[in-house]
Every structure is written in C-alpha cells, then in structure tokens.
Regions:
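N-proximal low-complexity "stem/linker" segments adjacent to membrane-targeting elements
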Residues: 273-336
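A conserved acidic beta->alpha catalytic loop
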Residues: 352-360
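Gly/Ser-rich helix-loop-strand patches that form or flank binding pockets
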Residues: 4, 19-24, 90-140, 221-273
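Terminal low-complexity segments of carbohydrate-biosynthetic enzymes
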Residues: 279, 526, 530-612
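Acceptor/aglycone-binding surface of glycosyltransferases and processive sugar-polymer synthases
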Residues: 378-386, 412-486
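Short aromatic/hydrophobic "clamp" motif used to bind/position activated sugar donors
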Residues: 402
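Small/aliphatic-rich secondary-structure junction motif
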Residues: 1-53, 64-77, 142-207, 226, ...
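Cell-envelope/extracellular polymer assembly enzymes that use nucleotide-activated donors
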Residues: 313-315, 347, 508
Length: 612
C-alpha cells in the first residue's frame, strides 16, 4: 500500500515506536525517511541553517541503532525551513513520500489546538495521506478498534488498519457509527469495501452504533489496545475540522491512537509550494541542506559499511603533470589510510599528462598504476589539458563512484578523499560533489590566510550569479577536488582545459537539478599558486565556457564573433610587447557515446563464463 513513509522527529531518541509502525505498514524494500527540520528565523537567510545542520545530521544518524529491520531501508534527512510545517510539507513533495507519519506527544499546551500548531496546520491541507500517531510502543497491540462512519476517510482507515493488523497479527473490531448527518456522502465505495472486509481473517467483530457514537467509542476503546480513526472533512476556509468524535477520543482516551486524513490533490499542493518560494530561498535552502563538513564522515568503518551495503566500487583518479614534489606524499597518505588499512577505495590510479620529471616513477614505485592520457583511446586523438585527462580517465577507472583530487596539494589528508565520498554514500539523491576549503596564498616565504581562489572570485562566481544564479551557493566552483557517480559523469561532455570544472557544474545542474549537487568543506588546502598571467588565461578559457552554455540556452548569440585568441602583455626590458596565444578548450562528447567505452563497460558487466 505504501512505499515511502516520512517521519518528522523533534526528539530522535524517541523514534522507535514510530519506526515500528512504519515498518509494519511497508512491504519489503520499502523506505522510511526520518526527518529533522532545522528552523531558521523568518527574516533570516535559510543558509544560516548550515551552522546547525552537521550537529543534527550526527543526531539523526543515531536512529540507525534503534532500527533493525533489514527488509526496510532507513534514510535520515536534515532539512532547513522558516517553519516546521513548511519544511515537512516541502520534504513530502521533494522526496515523493506517499505517507506522512506525524508523531504526537499526546497533549498540547494551546487550548484552541487539538494536536498543536504544526500538526493542526499540516492536517488543514495534508501534502499526502497523513497519520497522527500517539503511542509509546506498538509491539503489544493485538486488538484494534476502527470506528468508521462512511465518510471520505473511511476507506483509508480501513486499508491502514487491515495492513497493520496483518503485520502485527492483531484482531480488528469494526465499529460502524451509523449516525444521521446533514451532509450527504456517497457510501457505496465504503459499503463495497465493508462487504469485502467481512471475509478478512483479522476482522473479529463488526458492531453498529446508532445515534451519538462518542460514548460508545470511548467505552469500546477500553477493551482495545489501539484506536484508528478517520478525520471528518467539511469546507471551512479558516481551518480544518476533525469532528467532535475525534476530538473527544484524543482528549479523553490515553490508549495508542492513530488519526488518518487524506490530502488535497498533490498538484494543488505542489503549485502552492512553488509559488511561495523564491530563487534566493531555494538556493539558501540548498546551501544549508547540501553543504557538508569532512569531519561528518571521519568514521571510516561506517563509510565502509555503507559501501558494502550499496555494493558499489570506488576509484580515485590523480591527474598529474610534473608533480614529483607532492605526488609521493599524496599517494602514501591516501593509500595507507583508505586502501591498505581499510578498503574504502578499490583503486588509486595516476592519470599523467606526459610529465618530464619523476612523477611517473614515484607513483609506480609506490605500487600505483599510471596511465598517460595521450595513450588512452589514441584513435580519438589527444588534447592538452586537465579536462582531457579526466575525460579519458573515465575509460580506465573501474569504479561506480569516481573521485578526483589534484596532485599539487602540500597538506594532504585522507579527508580530502573521504570528505568527497561521504555525501555520495550517505545520500542516494546526490550525484556530484564539489570540495571547498580555505586557500592560503604563499608570498615569498610567508603564508597568508587570505588570497587564493582569485579566478573563482573575480570570474566564476560573478558569472554564475549573473547567468546561473541557481549555482550561486557553490563556494568554490573551480576547486580541483570533486567526484560523482559514473552513471552521470559518463553522460555529460568534458571541456579539455581550464573550463572542465565550469562545464561539468553547469551541465550536471542542467541535467539533474540542484538537489543532485553537494559541496563539502575540506578545511584547508595549501598548494602551488599560479602567476597572474596564468590566471588571466584561465579566466579567458572559463568565460568561453560560460558563453558556450549561454548560447545553448539562447541567452546570447555572440560566440561565432568572439575572438578565441588572447593577447598577452610581455615586458621586455623597458618596453612591452604583445604575444598572441590561442586559448580555446575543446569539448569532448559524453564518454557514453564512445564505442570503445561502451564495449568495455558491457564486457565488465557480463557474468563469469558468459560468451563474448
């Protein structure tokens, strides 16, 4: 009946009875979504929620210790919102939940509220089929009472009670409240369902009450362990209406209670959410929910457990060109921690771009395979640039998840790798992860805290804010540490040079949406800083990528007239000269379109002993 149940939690330590109920309602391979909403003051940016999000994610992770049913998948979520009911409703829509289970503490401090502000507001217009649940333990519930009147929620209550009774091996008493009502309902679906339910083995008693049923329900409830009751609907613009029967049962009876209500149409609810949220709010919300810290994933055993559960393989590619000063320490640090001591990675591979120093020798001496990118897929030619090396690395790397980090890092730490990997293992919806960090700049022998990332701040971020504002929350779009799922990386083109990071970010966003992208704070990165003339050339190439993508979206039509060469100013003694340099990234097609790649992937997918 249900496939995905969302449970918002105020106190995750008390999640067990609600997890038990959700498990009893789900089929095998169903999914429970446990949600914690981080509240941000109404007039503050949602991005402020990023400060508390890691703490709440750690708190939610502890729920796994309360959950032991291997048939059901448990996923924990932390989301930010200006209001609790808003955050819950948005998550229902975004996650495609088909049942919302609202835990209720059993009382409210507001006399004019039945369940409390948040639940009452959600029940006014439920975003999907909804339960309000009061219980400390469902394991001992063996006798259910279902009072029904044939109203619009009767069939839902009957279906729910039937499924729950079947899972818990409980008996059901159906109490038909045949009270006269000024409102006319078509009871034929209810009566048809009632006839079918007579033959259900868990139905033990069928009672009919005439007149006012309130006291009959209260009296009968004393002989049962659980009461499941449907809300009553009526048109009332100022609020929702559960009806006096439900209100009295909720207030006077301390038995475990489930109140059910069905929604307005999903289309109407979704349209209301879309109208109420601005672009800036969507970006702020993404920033808070999809920005992680590497120390959230420092428990490597837990990452390994997630890897095994998902049955994925993981590759680390190290693009290199004359990096003999740093590549040895990078390989030793990562290999010892993430391959030798604990097999989180399945392979580490160096993708060299024809280095003339000892880069290749150092890597091979440390037992790491080295491929020269000019020799990969030679029938497709070769271009200069890091993007070319990354594109070709897709052909030689074997993993389902592919990570890349630069090889000029001087303060390498395993967290540069497991930080990128964590969100991909933790959140199935995340498909691409970017790193960000503090970037000190070295001037002479002095190391300054500021500086670094100059092309990012002067070129990439201004262009993103102007033309792709949905990506304006990406802190360092040009960072060289990133990774993703093969299934998405093989479906997008790669620019061959400086534009590779920009192109990937825009193309993955256009294809999969902002929610598929995450970023991770990798703390501090010390590396070799480039000269201003080199950064100028980098900016020139990156701007061309922006223009390529803008033209494809019909925002501008200038590319055919754009000059692809750049005049570089060179000092010569007391004078200057101009040097012309052609700076243009080539664009490699999606790797999935390359026949040799497809053949190689298909051969790996064949079972052992299969004919080729």
């Amino acid at each position: 009946m249900f496939k995905k149940i969302l449970i918002p939690l105020i106190d995750p330590s008390r999640a067990l009875p609600y997890l038990q109920l959700a498990t009893a309602l789900l089929p095998e391979e169903g999914k429970v979504l446990a949600l914690k909403v981080v509240l941000v003051p109404e007039h503050s940016s949602l991005s402020e929620g990023a400060e508390k999000a890691p703490e709440h994610r750690a708190e939610m992770d502890k729920i796994e210790f309360q959950f032991s049913d291997e048939r059901i998948e448990l996923k924990t979520l932390v989301r930010v919102a200006h209001g609790l009911s808003q955050g819950i409703a948005e998550t229902v829509v975004n996650e495609g939940s088909d049942l919302l289970l609202l835990p209720w503490k059993g009382y409210t401090t507001s006399e004019d509220k039945l369940f409390g502000v948040t639940i009452d507001r959600l029940l006014e217009r439920p975003p999907c089929r909804t339960l309000v649940v009061r219980a400390s333990d469902f394991s001992g519930c063996r006798r259910f009472l279902l009072p029904v009147r044939g109203g619009p929620y009767a069939e839902f209550a009957l279906e729910l009670g039937s499924q729950l009774a079947k899972s818990l091996n409980a008996d059901v008493t159906l109490l038909h409240c045949d009270a006269p009502s000024p409102e006319k309902h078509d009871n034929r679906p209810y009566l048809d369902f009632l006839q079918r339910l007579r033959f259900y083995p868990n139905l033990r008693r069928l009672l009919t009450v005439h007149g006012n049923p309130e006291q009959a329900i209260i009296d009968e409830a004393q002989r049962h362990d659980l009461v499941i009751v449907g809300a009553v609907a009526r048109a009332e613009p100022d609020g929702f209406f559960l009806g006096p029967i439900v209100e009295r049962v909720a207030r006077e009876m301390q038995k475990p209670l489930v109140v059910v209500k069905t929604p307005d149409t999903m289309r109407a609810w979704r349209e209301g959410l879309d109208r109420s949220k601005t672009l800036s709010e969507r970006v702020d919300q993404w920033f808070a929910e999809n920005t992680f810290q590497r120390n959230e994933f420092a428990d490597l055993e837990k990452l390994l457990e997630l890897k095994k559960k998902q049955q994925v393989t993981i590759s680390l590619g190290l693009p290199a060109l004359n990096e003999d000063e740093t590549i040895g320490e990078i390989i030793r640090t990562v290999k010892n921690a993430l391959l030798d001591d604990l097999p989180l990675l399945d392979e580490i591979v160096v993708i060299d771009s024809a280095s003339t120093d000892d880069t290749v020798k150092i890597a091979r001496d440390l037992g790491v395979p080295v491929y020269v990118h000019q020799e990969i897929l030679p029938e497709h030619g070769s271009n200069r640039g890091k993007g070319e090396a990354l594109w070709k690395s897709l052909h030689v790397l074997k993993g389902d998840i592919i990570l890349w980090i630069d090889t000029d890092i001087k303060n390498i730490h395993p967290g540069f790798v497991y930080g990128l990997l964590g969100p991909l293992l933790r959140e199935p919806e995340i498909r691409y992860v970017k790193g960000f960090y503090r970037r000190p700049i070295k001037v002479g022998e002095e190391l300054y805290a500021g500086g670094g990332g100059r092309v990012t701040e002067l070129t990439a971020r201004p262009f993103l804010n102007l033309f792709f504002p949905e990506l304006s929350g990406i802190i360092q779009p040009l960072a060289g540490e990133y990774g993703g799922r093969r299934e998405v990386l093989e479906r997008v083109p790669f620019f061959t040079g400086y534009g590779v990071e920009t192109g990937l970010l825009i193309d993955l966003y256009n294809r999969y949406g902002l929610g598929a992208i995450a970023q991770v704070d990798l703390e501090e990165r010390i590396h070799r800083n480039q000269s201003l003339p080199a950064l100028s050339q980098m900016s020139f190439a990156i701007i061309q990528v922006f223009m390529e993508r803008l033209q494809e979206r019909n925002r501008i039509d200038l590319l055919e007239e754009v000059n692809r060469s750049m005049k570089l100013v060179k000092g010569r003694g007391n004078s200057y000269a101009l040097e012309v340099k052609n700076i243009r990234d080539q664009e490699r097609p999606p790797m999935l379109t390359i026949p040799e790649y497809r053949a190689k992937r298909q051969s790996r997918a064949m079972p052992a002993g299969a004919a080729v």
